[in-house]
């Protein structure tokens, strides 16, 4: 009975996975490798499989491959940023909250093989489980198809959303805007808090970003830091839209 259930789950996974790869425009050779990438330890335990057949080793590899891929992207995209800033930006992209966003864009959690108990307790929507599966998939893709395929995947699933509104708080817009200013030799950037309002337990802060003694944009947030990020985001987007600052 258990073996039949396992066969059904694996067959269902293979069909869904094949369809998913087609939709992403990606090729694969070793489907067993990807099955391992999506096998949570609870699935392995339920069917008394070898404990090394779960996805944790591939997750370990995928984390390193993601760091390399994102490092190259940031290195090429931000030629004026020093190492410290690049490291900070990479850390905010290759982290659980952002990986969950990327995974959810393509509904990767639908592929995860879970044990009965883990499924019942909501494991399929658990952020840590989703981000782990995302990293494991990248590790499997690297082993099966190489770094070029990982880059192709990242171009479709990661890079387009790095500066998306949904990732505000993940992307450091203050750093992005500072880089633009540096590349244009436009002088120093400063931030000024111009308003605080609301009760103590629900404050709203408004900050403006100042470039060459001129306020160029403002933003609001629940903290001073968030309001500065919002102001920098507005200034950065004005720059991207080629409007004068």
Curated annotation (Swiss-Prot):
- The record's EC number reads 3.1.26.3
GO function terms (MF aspect): double-stranded RNA binding; metal ion binding; ribonuclease III activity; rRNA binding
- EC class name: hydrolase
InterPro entries reported in the protein's UniProt record: dsRBD_dom, RNase_III, RNase_III_dom, RNase_III_sf
The source's superkingdom equals: Bacteria
Q: Which cofactor does it need?
A: Mg(2+)
Residue intervals of the RNase III domain: 17-146
Cellular location(s): Cytoplasm
Q: Which UniProt keywords apply?
A: Cytoplasm, Endonuclease, Hydrolase, Magnesium, Metal-binding, mRNA processing, Nuclease, RNA-binding, rRNA processing, rRNA-binding, tRNA processing
- A GO BP annotation: tRNA processing
Q: Where are the transmembrane segments?
A: none
Cytoplasm as UniProt keyword = yes
Q: Which reaction does it catalyse?
A: Endonucleolytic cleavage to 5'-phosphomonoester
- Report the active site residues: 63, 135
Q: What coarse category fits the chief subcellular location reported for this protein?
A: cytoplasm
Which residues does Mg(2+) bind?
59, 132, 135
The UniProt record lists the keyword Cytoplasm: yes
Cite the DRBM domain residue spans from the record. 172-241
This entry carries the following GO cellular component terms, namely: cytoplasm
Q: Which family does it belong to?
A: Belongs to the ribonuclease III family.
Could you tell me what this protein does? Digests double-stranded RNA. Involved in the processing of primary rRNA transcript to yield the immediate precursors to the large and small rRNAs (23S and 16S). Processes some mRNAs, and tRNAs when they are encoded in the rRNA operon. Processes pre-crRNA and tracrRNA of type II CRISPR loci if present in the organism.
Q: How does it assemble?
A: Homodimer.
- Please name the NCBIfam families in this protein's record: RNaseIII
Tell me what this protein is called: Ribonuclease 3
Organism in which the protein naturally occurs: Staphylococcus epidermidis (strain ATCC 12228 / FDA PCI 1200)
Gene responsible for this protein: rnc
């Amino acid at each position: 009975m258990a073996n039949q259930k396992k066969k059904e789950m694996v067959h269902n996974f293979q069909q869904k996975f094949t369809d998913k790869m087609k939709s992403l425009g990606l090729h694969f050779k070793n489907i067993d490798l990807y099955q391992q990438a999506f096998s949570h330890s609870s699935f392995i335990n339920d069917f008394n499989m070898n404990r090394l057949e779960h996805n944790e080793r591939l997750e370990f590899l995928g984390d390193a491959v993601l760091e390399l891929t994102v490092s190259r992207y940031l290195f090429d995209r931000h030629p004026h940023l020093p190492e410290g800033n690049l490291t900070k930006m990479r850390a905010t992209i290759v982290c659980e909250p952002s990986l969950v966003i990327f995974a959810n864009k393509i509904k990767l959690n639908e592929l995860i093989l879970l044990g009965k108990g883990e499924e019942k307790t909501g494991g399929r929507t658990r952020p840590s489980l989703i981000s782990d599966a995302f990293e494991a998939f990248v590790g499997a893709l690297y082993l099966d198809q190489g770094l070029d395929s990982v880059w192709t995947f990242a171009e479709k699933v990661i890079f387009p959303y790095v500066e998306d509104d949904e990732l505000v708080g993940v992307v450091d817009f203050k750093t992005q805007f500072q880089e633009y200013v540096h590349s244009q030799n436009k002088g120093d950037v400063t931030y000024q808090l111009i308003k605080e309002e609301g009760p103590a337990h629900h404050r709203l802060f408004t900050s403006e970003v100042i470039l060459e003694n001129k306020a160029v944009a403002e933003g609001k947030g629940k903290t001073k830091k968030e309001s500065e990020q919002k102001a920098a985001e507005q200034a950065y987007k004005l720059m991207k839209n080629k409007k004068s600052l």
